[in-house]
Amino acid sequence: MPPKKSNARNASLLKEAVTNAGRSDTASTAREGSIAATFVSDSDSSTTASGPVDEKVAAVAELITTLTTNAASDKRQSAADDIAKFVEAEGVAQMVKTKILHGIATGLHNTKQPVAREGAITAIETLIKSPVSKQIEPYMITFIPVLLERLSDKAKTVCLAADSALKALITRLTPYATKQVLPLLLAGIEYSQKWQTKVGALELMQSLSKTAPRQMTTAVPDLVPPLSEVMHDTKAEAKNAGRQTMEAICELINNKDIEKFIPALIDTIANPEKVPDTVHLLGATTFVSEVLPPTLAIMVPLLSRGLNERQTAIKRKAAVIIINMCKLVEKPQIIAPFLPRLLPTLEKIQDDVADPECRQVCQNATKILTKVGIPAPGTVMDDSYEFKKLDDKALAYLKKAIGHQQITEIPEAYRPVLEYLEHIAAAMVADGNMDNDDWNGSIIPTLKAFIPTEGTVTNAVKEFRELSFGSNVKEAVAEEEEDDAEELCNCEFSLAYGARVLLNRTHLILKRGHRYGLTGANGSGKSTLMRAIANGQVEGFPPADQLKTVAVEHDLDGAHEHDNKEVQAFVLEDPVYAHLPKETVVNMLESVGFKGPMATRPVGQLSGGWRMKLALARAMLHNADILLLDEPTNHLDVINVAWLQDYLIGLKTVTSIIVSHDSSFLDIVCSDIIHLDNFKLKRYRGNLSKFVEAVPEAKAYYELGAAQQTFRFPEPGMLEGVKTKERAILKVQNAVFQYPGTDRRQLNGVTFQCSLGSRVAVVGPNGAGKSTLIKLLCGVIEPDNGVVWRHPNLRIAYVAQHAFEHIEKHTNLTPNQYIQWRYQTGEDREEMEKAARQISAEEEAAMKKVQVISGEKKVVDSVIGRRKLKNSYEYEVSWVGKLSNENSWLPRDTLIEMGFLKKVQEIDQAEAARQGLARPLTQKEIEKHLSDVGIDSEIGTHSHIRGLSGGQKVKVVIAGAMWQRPHLLVLDEPTNFLDRDSLGALKTAIDAYGGGVIMVTHSREFSEAICKEVWKVDNGELTPTGHNWVSGQGSGPRLEDKNKDEEVFDAFGNKIDVAKQKSKLSGKDLRKKRKEREARRKRGEEVSDDDE
């Protein structure tokens, strides 16, 4: 809650009024520092001199006497009218000198004579309604505290008069004077013991909400706390008025996200037991509007109470609302006053609550509150809702104008005018209002009493306005560079995706021929913004008939429907290009490399790089004004990347917006960088290197090691017989593979091996066979010829080039649910779907052959399990028509010769999976695993996969693959979709990972930072360099099992007690044991067989 703003002066004025209500007339007249004395200058001795002034003083004194003593109301009104006419004719200076205000104040404080009080109030109301009301408004404001007290006067007529006068003043009040009046009204609520005074002050606030809505809106943070207290007042009238005023004030809050919940928010203030229901209600809200102090003022009481609820779910949801709202706060000064209500409670929850997820959410809320609400060192806090002292030069000028050159000491009688104009000017400066008409309308009516000449007073206000702004001028929007490029777009918009806000009231300006690099973290909304532009969903963006915008995304939409069509026919038969001459289409296809056989190749046989080229060619046939390129270098080799760079730079009349994590590509191509951060788009002139100079935290674009994120991969388990990281755990010899229906081999006699220490980069041009090689290594495909050997317990994690294929059938699940589905049977369900696991018809027939075992003919029913046999394994086999006690154990080689290779591999994979899945498949364990690859619990457990960004989906795929603690991690184009910070985190995780890593990538920067070994693939042949292949264990350091002390769990989270293996005794120990047994026998002790 912001601190109460009722200053000491306002409180003392009210207390003074209350105290003086019981004094005698003489005492109230003589008191020093009273309200009446305010209007008498210490140097005003000239009023006693003889002459015209004496006559005016006498005439005014007679009117004051009639006003405060005459019992007839019409006589008192007549006297009040004459006083108003006198002030109108003679001006403010004569009003002060003739002590009119002094006389009114004296009558107002006359506690013995109701007629005096009523007459004084009549004069006040008459002056307020007179033509000179604006000139004397500063003085009328000073009567507010006493008039509020007169609302509870014993004389009913005085109460009614005070009520009428206050309403007349408030309805005519200059709007920008609201900031000066509100503390006086708040004092009436907070310090008065009379309910009539409270109700009156509350009703005046309601009036102000109609006459000065803009000014009252900025004051909402000051008003909500005291109004909340009044809503619990013991007096029903005050309580009801407080509720009505709160409703009137909250109607001013301009936030479409919460406006329908405002009645419920007010209800929770009056009825705290409704807090849980309201928190649930707001927890399902998508926040897209900018959050300002008025919104926080009504939300923070609910959130504070929500954090203090007993239910953990309510605490968590309140913290989530805080996170979502903080993302829409632009400046620290907006939220800083509310931090004391939220931060201590959030920090306490982190220490006290048992639920780790709730603690994590509260920790995240604390971080974002601290980041948003506590400014960086050197930042100047600018609270627009506090009264700010004017610039000294402006104040000096104002004193000069009012005091007629008496700059050093202005007459005390004019002090109310000075304070009034200072408040108005400060309020207009805080509002950023430099409009001449507003300044003239607010200040000239009062200032012209001191500068009567119209031209002079107008110039004075102009100079005063300029001096008032002084150093408080708000930061102007940076001007666009001065060039002659045509402006294609200039719009302000917000953007949300599902329940997540991506951009909030941000500007987008695009110019013809510029090439904009769109940067930002994964999940910040880059691809969503591109799609929104392409689909015409950006508010204010020119429509398609005015501006041709074409999107080039990372794959061909609907390409699966046309897999069998030839490339050239695929484009020519598309209705979109029917109006183009065939020659134009053919030339465009040839320009990106589709010549000769490539032009007639089926779309389904194109590699990822060729698919991207086809997408680019199709986009360029549109003759677009704006090209939207989302990761255009994905799947492109170095030659094609260079071609794309040259092509884009050569488009002098076409604007490009590019999302790419290829730093060298952005450096060469971009003329500008548009950075997406904190829900805003900010443009930086120059290429990526210039951007990094301006934003040092973006250093990760150049240095992968500078990443702020960190990933961590689980350590792989031990493999039997593997003592060092150099020993081969996978070997391929002379493997040959050719896709059916193709005219050449994709792999031709390739030989390689992998170990736990492998760090391999697979490189080569598009279509050379890199992805095919990886699929062979992982068992997705089997070779037509050659030998593939994998360690029987080897676990391989594979992230495909089109990583989304792993999760495309599970987009309605959360990442947490996806991992639970994938491993719920104890095995990797994706692994079971691989081609290497599927049994062909020929293999099925071979397995049904009759086998002769120990002279008996038998048919294999199934392979059940395995056990160790010297340096290999033997497998338990059940037979058709035989009981289980007749099962046999056959060596591995025997079963393979019988045609049961895939069944043997199935048992091996199941055993390997069992060893790798020794961890509980529970929500909490999976959340921890997901957090190790940069997916927090809010996304991992509470967001569906379909709502995630491309980079977040890739992280989910990596997490899913790493759950089984693999020995080999295979990444096909890992740099696709991941932002630079995530790539740096991935590099760090790979460096620390205890297993082998094989990756296909065109990113030389990424591969060189990680890989020592390079496999160059070209025309289906493999040329390895930098490898260290050994035939045995090698000479490296011996491995230690880092997971040996970890507890083992089944898939349901139940702990498994693992018996420790007994170490084999040496010969010396065995001989010692025998001697001990013989000695025990000689002593007559029994020695069991177990002891033997």
From Swiss-Prot:
EC number: 3.6.4.-
Recorded metabolic or biological pathway in which this protein acts: Protein biosynthesis; polypeptide chain elongation
InterPro entries: AAA+_ATPase, ABC_transporter-like_ATP-bd, ABC_transporter-like_CS, ABCF_EF3_subfamily, ARM-like, ARM-type_fold, Chromo-like_dom_sf, Chromo/chromo_shadow_dom
Start and stop residues of the HEAT repeats: 95-133, 138-175, 177-214, 218-255, 257-293, 294-331, 333-370
Biased composition (Basic and acidic residues): 1076-1086
Primary localization: cytoplasm
Reaction equations catalysed: ATP + H2O = ADP + phosphate + H(+)
GO terms, molecular function: ATP binding; ATP hydrolysis activity; RNA binding; translation elongation factor activity
Cellular localisation: Cytoplasm, Cytosol
GO annotation terms (biological process): cytoplasmic translational elongation; regulation of biosynthetic process
Binding positions (ADP): 92, 454, 766, 973, 976, 1002
Pfam families found in the cross-reference section: ABC_tran, HEAT_EF3_GNC1, HEAT_EF3_N
Biased composition (Basic residues): 1063-1075
Domain ABC transporter, chain residue ranges per copy: 486-704, 730-1044
UniProt keywords, alphabetically: ATP-binding, Cytoplasm, Elongation factor, Hydrolase, Nucleotide-binding, Protein biosynthesis, Repeat, RNA-binding
Broadest EC class assigned to this enzyme: hydrolase
CC per GO annotation: cytosol
Task of the protein: Ribosome-dependent ATPase that functions in cytoplasmic translation elongation. Required for the ATP-dependent release of deacylated tRNA from the ribosomal E-site during protein biosynthesis. Stimulates the eEF1A-dependent binding of aminoacyl-tRNA to the ribosomal A-site, which has reduced affinity for tRNA as long as the E-site is occupied. Assists translation termination by stimulating the release of nascent protein from the ribosome by release factors.
Family: Belongs to the ABC transporter superfamily. ABCF family. EF3 subfamily.
Protein's name in the database: Elongation factor 3
